């Protein structure tokens, strides 16, 4: 078993500083945050230690990332991006899905082979309606993962942010019953 962490906790660090920290503390791997470049909407979102789009376009950048981590004896075990892929705002949904697909492609290009993410949830819809939405949203994401030979790991955190948020959270798959249906 390897011990690692999600790099989003080191939100003020560069990719090199994050990998150096992991190495110095004796971690064997990291789940590297890959949010789109720009301002965060919530805590830990917006952290981008690896720029997925750049990793797809710039071969030297992709090689540098993998070689730097390898030289520090730190494996990049997964690329991490946890958006709400079922956001009721269709423009937001389209934007996050396209970035998630690019994170999947980058994971393949970097030889990582794993992306960690959420299913998401339309907080204004019922569980049953969200289960139908999964059937609309996720096939194209899974298709990209299959094409790139990248596995997807789904986190089941309910994403409950506080009393001002709807009690169902922002992630559909938080119970065994819902997991079985998905």
Language model regions located:
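Structural motif corresponding to the early beta-alpha repeats
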Residues: 27-139, 146-151
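N-terminal amphipathic alpha-helix/helix-capping segment at the start of soluble metabolic enzymes
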Residues: 1-4, 69
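Short secondary-structure capping/turn segments at boundaries of alpha-helices and beta-strands
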Residues: 18-19, 65
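Acidic/histidine-rich catalytic cores of soluble enzymes
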Residues: 2, 13, 17, 23, ...
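N-terminal beta1-alpha1 ligand-phosphate binding loop
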Residues: 6-10
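Loop/helix-junction capping segments adjacent to catalytic residues or to phosphate/diphosphate-binding pockets
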Residues: 12-13, 124
């Amino acid at each position: 078993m390897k011990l690692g962490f999600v790099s989003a906790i080191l939100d003020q660090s560069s990719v090199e500083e994050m990998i150096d920290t992991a190495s110095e503390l004796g971690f064997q791997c990291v789940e590297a945050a890959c949010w789109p470049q720009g301002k965060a909407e919530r805590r830990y979102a917006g952290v981008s230690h690896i720029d997925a789009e750049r990793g797809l376009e710039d071969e030297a950048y992709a090689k540098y990332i993998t070689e730097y981590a390898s030289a520090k004896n730190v494996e990049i075990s997964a690329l991490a991006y946890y958006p709400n892929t079922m956001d009721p705002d269709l423009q937001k949904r389209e934007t996050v899905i396209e970035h998630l697909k690019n994170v999947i492609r980058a994971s393949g290009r970097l030889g990582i082979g794993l992306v960690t993410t959420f299913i998401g949830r339309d907080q204004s819809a019922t569980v049953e309606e969200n289960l139908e939405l999964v059937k609309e949203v996720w096939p194209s994401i899974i298709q990209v993962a299959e094409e790139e030979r990248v596995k997807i790991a789904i986190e089941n955190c309910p994403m409950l942010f506080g009393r001002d948020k709807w009690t169902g959270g922002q992630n559909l798959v938080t119970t065994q019953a819902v997991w079985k249906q998905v």
